[in-house]
UniProtKB/Swiss-Prot annotation:
One of its GO terms (molecular function) is polygalacturonase activity. Its main location: secreted. It comes from Aspergillus niger (strain ATCC MYA-4892 / CBS 513.88 / FGSC A1513). GO terms for cellular component: extracellular region. Keywords: Cell wall biogenesis/degradation, Disulfide bond, Glycoprotein, Glycosidase, Hydrolase, Repeat, Secreted, Signal, Zymogen. PbH1 repeats lie at residues 162-192, 193-214, 215-235, 244-265, 273-295, 307-352. This is Probable endopolygalacturonase A. It is found in: Secreted.
Amino acid sequence: MPSAKPLFCLATLAGAALAAPAPSRVSDFTKRSTCTFTDAATASESKTSCSDIVLKDITVPAGETLNLKDLNDGTTVTFEGTTTWEYEEWDGPLLRISGKDITVTQSSDAVLDGNGAKWWDGEGTNGGKTKPKFFYAHDLDDSKISGLYIKNTPVQAISVESDNLVIEDVTIDNSDGDSEGGHNTDGFDISESTYITITGATVKNQDDCVAINSGENIYFSGGTCSGGHGLSIGSVGGRDDNTVKNVTFIDSTVSDSENGVRIKTVYDATGTVEDITYSNIQLSGISDYGIVIEQDYENGDPTGTPSNGVTISDVTLEDITGSVDSDAVEIYILCGDGSCSDWTMSGIDITGGETSSDCENVPSGASCDQ
C-alpha cells in the first residue's frame, strides 16, 4: 500500500495527548505548529495550518509552482536539503511566496536548484524553449529573505514586487550558464516596489545583476556581481509604472560583465528617474561600458537616437573605479534634449578603455571625459 504523503505537525501531535481545548484555542495552537513537508502538493495545500514551515528535499513536479502564496502573518519558511524542479516548457514561476511579516531562510547546506541547463539554449526569453521564471517575491510585504543559495535558474531568478522587503546574504549562482547557454538570467528584477533593501548578495549570471524597472526607496549594498550586465536601472518607460526614485547602489563590485553601471530609458516613452546614487562601485573585466546612461532603447535595443520623455535627474556618481577592456568605452552618456539634469560626478577613475566621442546632451556636472 503506498505511503501517505508525510506531514509532521509536531505541536499538533503534542496537543493530541492532552484534553481537547476549545475550538478557538485549537486554531491558534495549530497555527503555531512546526510542519515538515517533503512534497510540494502537501506543502501548498497545508501551508496555512503551520506558522513554521520546513521544506525538506522536495522535488516539484514538471509544470507546477511550489506555491506558498498567502501565508499566515508571521510565518517562517525554511528550506532544507535540495529543492529541485522537474522539466517542462512553461512560463512559471517555479516558486511563489507571499504574505506579511514572513521570514524565508534555509539550513546551512540547502540548495534551491532550478535545473536551468534543461532549458538553456542560448535564447533566454527571446525564443527557443519556453522557460519559467524562478521565484516570485510578489506581495511579500514587511518580510525578509535571508541566506538562500539558488542555483541554475532557467531565466530570471528573483522577481520582486513588494513593500518593505529585506533580502540579505542571498547567492544566485548561474555560472554554469556561461558555458551551457544561460541567457536572461537576471539576479533581481524589481518593479512596483517600495523600501527594498538588498545586502550582501552574490550574483553570477548572464544578465543584469539587478534591474530596477520601477519603484522607490531601493537600497543595494555589499553586492558581488559577475558575468552579467551590471547594476542597472531600466529600461524605464512603456509600463504601467514608470517611476524610479531614491535608489542607492553602494559598496559593491562588478566583474567580468558587459557593463558596470547602467541607466536606460525607452525611446519616445514617458517616466521619471530621480534621486539616484552609485557610490563606491569597483569594476574589473568590463567588456562594453564602465558607466552607460542612455535614452534610446526601442524594442529592447539601443538605437543611437535619444528622446526626452523620461527625465533623469538628481544623479550622483561617485567613487566608481576600476578597469574595462581595451575595446570597451569607459563612460557613455546619451541624453535627450533637456531631459537630464542635476548630476554630479566625483572620484571617477575608470581605466583601460576608450573615451566616447558619441555622447550627447551631457548635463552640467557630468562628463564623458574623466
